[in-house]
Amino acid sequence: VPVGGTAADCESAELSLAYFSEGDVARLAYFRNLSALDITAADVSPALFESIRSAYPALSVRWSIPIGESRYPSDAESITLTDFAVSDLPLFDYFTALRAADARDCTCYDAILSLRGKYPALELQWKVPLGGAEYLQDAADIAVDEVSLTPDALRTALRYLPAAQTVSFPDCPWSEEEKTALRGEFPNISFRWSVELFGTSYPSDTAELSFAGRPITAEDLSELGERLSSFSALERVDLVDTGVALEDMLPLCKAYPAVDFA
């Protein structure tokens, strides 16, 4: 029987074809004993596969699934992905045994996150470049030392690093407004960078600040009120002998109720 650009015995129980067309769907009916069809080497579209499955629901069909610019065996347990689109996600339903996908060479991060959301049981790997380093999807601690990095670059990278817990950027040159915006966007991440206060730099995870004996002006107090929000772990501020009146402290105490002002 002519099929797939060749001829095959009509008594065959299995067929392996390098070419398959819509016209071959009807020809399969001549193979009365056929139980398995391997067309992984053929350029078969999902629509053509559906035609085969609809006509022969009991037939075991092994084919190659087109995703992005690559094709993958339908019975693959693990695959190495090239870039793909969100619109390709329904094609992953055709895999019969897929358990792992390696997307470390992909840059289609929105599609990767969509794939992760659609198939949470899939072991999915990817990596995200940040500054001069790369981080796997399960990275918890991010260390940044490239001062030319922009807030938007870090923001973009963090969106694709769902396991990130801490970001360390000791020489961060950004404004306090830019830092505050990032903390607000990623409240579950602890940012560790330097905070400039009264001409001195302090780590943002400082727990206690002391300005005891240093004269504090109204302008200084205003700066203090603005900067304290940058300290993520602050517990105590020592203002003994600074000349600050109690009534001037009330707005600060109200703004930071968890901080002990002494």
Residue locations for each model-derived region?
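N-terminal capping/linker segments that flank leucine-rich repeat
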Residues: 1-262
